[in-house]
């Protein structure tokens, strides 16, 4: 049973030491972005390998072509899917993301394929989980559900990328309610 029977990757994610620095570098090198930076992101619920614990992380989100790029910076040593792969000072590829409209069904498929659920969270009316697929791709695979409000946010970020010109700011302000 192939993992990508129905969905394509929508995201590549990288663990970095400094999210803002990574956004600046990718904007200069690849004209990626602009990026939205979410400092010290908090979830409504967060489970890591069956334990209710949440690491202190900052995220950066932007586009390079049609691919969303995510940068992750962990500010503490709490056990996490990030510390599973990287110690302090280390950086690199972390996960690919699938935007799915049948979250429960896709979780069941991943379970049937024998991958281990490493992390699950709920934030901003969105469910997401990460399966440990390091034996397959050297990282994790994220399943991210697709409610309309998140699709609208992603479309706005993608449009900002389409309008981006070399030299524009790498980071754009985050609009919050």
Which positions does each model-derived feature cover?
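Glyoxalase I/VOC metalloenzyme domain signal
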Residues: 1-10, 14-36, 49-116, 132-177
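Short acidic/glycine-enriched loop/turn segments that link adjacent beta-strands
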Residues: 8, 124-127
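Short beta-strand
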Residues: 119-122
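Conserved beta-strand edge residues that scaffold enzyme active sites
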Residues: 40-41, 124
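Short, charge-patterned binding micro-sites
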Residues: 42-47
């Amino acid at each position: 049973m192939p993992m990508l029977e129905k969905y394509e990757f929508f995201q590549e994610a990288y663990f970095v030491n400094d999210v803002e620095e990574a956004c600046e570098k990718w904007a200069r090198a690849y004209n990626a972005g602009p990026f939205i930076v979410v400092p010290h992101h908090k979830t409504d619920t967060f489970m890591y390998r069956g334990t209710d614990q949440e690491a202190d992380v900052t995220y950066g989100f932007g586009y390079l072509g049609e691919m969303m790029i995510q940068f992750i910076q962990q500010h503490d040593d709490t056990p996490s899917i990030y510390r599973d792969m990287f110690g302090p000072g280390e950086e690199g590829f972390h996960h690919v993301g699938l935007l799915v409209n049948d979250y429960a069904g896709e979780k069941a498929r991943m379970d049937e394929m024998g991958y281990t659920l490493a992390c699950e969270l709920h934030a901003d009316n969105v469910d997401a989980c990460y399966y440990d697929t390091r034996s397959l791709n050297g990282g994790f695979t994220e399943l991210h559900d697709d409610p309309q409000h998140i699709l609208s946010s992603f479309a706005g970020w993608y449009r900002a990328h389409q309008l981006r010109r070399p030299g524009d700011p790498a980071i754009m302000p985050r609009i919050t309610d």
